[in-house]
UniProtKB/Swiss-Prot annotation:
GO terms for molecular function: ATP binding; cyanophycin synthetase activity (L-arginine-adding); cyanophycin synthetase activity (L-aspartate-adding); metal ion binding. Its EC number is 6.3.2.29, 6.3.2.30. It comes from Nostoc sp. (strain PCC 7120 / SAG 25.82 / UTEX 2576). This is Cyanophycin synthetase. PANTHER family: CYANOPHYCIN SYNTHETASE, MUR LIGASE FAMILY MEMBER. It holds the Pfam family Cyanophycin_syn. It catalyses: [L-4-(L-arginin-2-N-yl)aspartate](n) + L-aspartate + ATP = [L-4-(L-arginin-2-N-yl)aspartate](n)-L-aspartate + ADP + phosphate + H(+); [L-4-(L-arginin-2-N-yl)aspartate](n)-L-aspartate + L-arginine + ATP = [L-4-(L-arginin-2-N-yl)aspartate](n+1) + ADP + phosphate + H(+). ATP binds at G493, T494, N495, G496, K497, T498, T499. In the C-terminal section; belongs to the MurCDEF family. Residues 224-478 form the ATP-grasp domain. The keyword Nucleotide-binding applies.
Amino acid sequence: MRILKIQTLRGPNYWSIRRHKLIVMRLDLETLAETPSNEIPGFYEGLVEALPSLEGHYCSPGCHGGFLMRVREGTMMGHIVEHVALELQELAGMHVGFGRTRETATPGIYQVVIEYLNEEAGRYAGRAAVRLCQSIVDRGRYPKAELEQDIQDLKDLWRDASLGPSTEAIVKEAEKRGIPWMQLSARFLIQLGYGVNHKRMQATMTDKTGILGVELACDKEATKRILAASGVPVPRGTVINFLDDLEEAIEYVGGYPIVIKPLDGNHGRGITIDIRSWEEAEAAYEAARQVSRSIIVERYYVGRDHRVLVVDGKVVAVAERVPAHVIGNGRSTVAELIEEINQDPNRGDGHDKVLTKIELDRTSYQLLERAGYTLNSVPPKGTICYLRATANLSTGGTAVDRTDEIHPENVWLAQRVVKIIGLDIAGLDIVTTDISRPLRELDGVIVEVNAAPGFRMHVAPSQGIPRNVAGAVMDMLFPNEQSGRIPILSVTGTNGKTTTTRLLAHIYKQTGKVVGYTTTDGTYIGDYLVESGDNTGPQSAHVILQDPTVEVAVLETARGGILRSGLGFESANVGVVLNVAADHLGIGDIDTIDQLANLKSVVAESVYPDGYAVLNADDRRVAAMAEKTKANIAYFTMNSESELVRKHIQKGGVAAVYENGYLSIVKGDWTHRIERAEQIPLTMGGRAPFMIANALAASLAAFVQNVSIEQIRAGLRTFRASVSQTPGRMNLFNLGNYHALVDYAHNPASYEAVGAFVRNWTSGQRIGVVGGPGDRRDEDFVTLGKLAAEIFDYIIVKEDDDTRGRPRGSASELITKGITQVKPDARYESILDETQAINKGLDMAPANGLVVILPESVSRAIKLIKLRGLVKEEIQQQNSSTTVIDNQNGVASSSVINTLL
């Protein structure tokens, strides 16, 4: 077997709307292409020996052991690889269960789809599954050592990429509230919400966390001085920089016992408490110097260690932290007790689980020695042996919830302290013998104020009630049940995507909002180009959704991006599907128009239930998407007699209809006439039906998002088929005694649309400079040739600079073949170089002629036209002298009439 390609999906996709995290592996079975598993000697036995846990896979039989039943009876290797890849992740602690295997149009080549939690782990699991299955085919077994290494590697990948318990708690709470989130490039840096409404967090610091507060909290001595000056009980202490000053510092704080810690440490690093001798003090000083140049020496206060969490000025959780320890059973040594406690499945390495495994350091041995034990000692039953001086969870400590026990005065004090330091989220370390009594009564002190406090001890205490502290953070960042969302409008289809996206963005600008939009020619925010290029995939969508100024996102969503990575967002408010026609077939294992429709249906299916899928009622494949989506439906149609739309409106639905020369919004008994088509510049005086359809779709998408009819009309009236607003989309130029038209038509449907306009526009000679992308099927080029023969009087066949793997001249020959099949006496020539072909077409243009250029490079075509000298871009203007009245009905366009279609 051979892996041909591995793709990572991260959003709603062709395989699943709900499951976003999928690996798609294109697998060539090679010699196993026609060999089911039951015909491979020893394969079943070898697979069960390697992965007996596959017994738990139900598969199509729908019962325990169902998958292995299929293997025994005979199934193809791609299917087996799918299940093995899922099981390997499961054995590494990643609970995944979704998979699909489909044979492509190429015999022996399969698409294997597996769910993942971590991208790298998912890709690794796919490759490891192929290795495992191939090994069993070749040798009858997969070595145990290799399997163990695979599982360990997967565990390492999973651990290294995990968000951490605090961030994970925040993410889960966001998901529960329907707040979208995304992980940014830096580890633990996440974005909650989109655009102007988004917030960012790193660990438990927010973008509202003040830098001065963080700096102050990190300088523990400065914090202590400020708090002491405010009457807050803090430990007596001082800061030293040299060992020679240590003895004087000990005397200053009142003698032993003392605490020594780094000035700017965290997570308990370099801290030693309950120091009772000079030797211990020297060792503690050196340990602290490993973390900081400046060392704090403090009086040691006897009591229990508490962490009080304050969010947005309120105490939301309190935990008593217990240092890492073991409890004797009268039989086991200290070392054995540590090993036993570390077997707890809730303990892991670092922060990857709710508790951390206990690891020993210098302090551990000192504590054991002080208690009269070694690692080989057997403590009496019930005896507590402390292994760490500090109670941090990161060093193996545990937590007991005390939220309901803290005294109101201590609550008030904690909240006051956090306000003094200036933090929105803070963790206070308080030492007192009883948190239910005021600190002042028990000589309790506030030891530290911590920025970015961990949430583990609160969300998963070893004893007591788990506290939803992430909920308090969400309440602070998104008060009053805010969702953090902005309107997202996604536009897809075979043709018209860019024009509709630009028009929709332009309409939205009439509302005064900042619109971010992506198209095949670039990414834009407001009136400015952010990045040029074909930006119709998820990465470009993220540029818009991460921008803090964007209030509305209008995203052109192309086939390629959905296939490669899925959508760049979880759900949209509006999903527009313009049409589905033959294009890109045979690419990415999308071989039929029905498959292409299923792919584009992802946009309609990924709309919020309270949003709208805006569908073309005149395209049966698009109209059928209404059955797949849970969203509301809004249809647009060029046919005012559409039976589908009539029934939809009778049921209370909304639609955009081209009727009596008007673009109208219809809902129930009411028709809102927006504008006469000939008054909309984009429609070229009403002579471009496909542009009317685009305008209907954009108007309807805006209407269902509560953009007013007046604002929609203003947008339609001021948007033109110009180089500045729609480059490469029906750009018409006046070159004196002839005209040139530039359009990025590159598939049969778009050729037909251009042809309809050309026939309506001129009766003069029509010259076509035609071609198509090299990765299309042979029959597609032949079809382009046939259509060109029907549209143009003279044809110049050219090829793209990038032939996309096709031999130079091949596409031209196929187009020529199509031309001659339709019109044997057609006038044509082949000039493969696009620049030369365009110049030839312009050179030979007769008076009153029209040169139609369908280029690979729109910018190059426009540049060549402008080099001709005095060139006027002819933009269809609104005819202000025309009274906007329907002569047939005598109704002003701005009025609302009672009409039932």
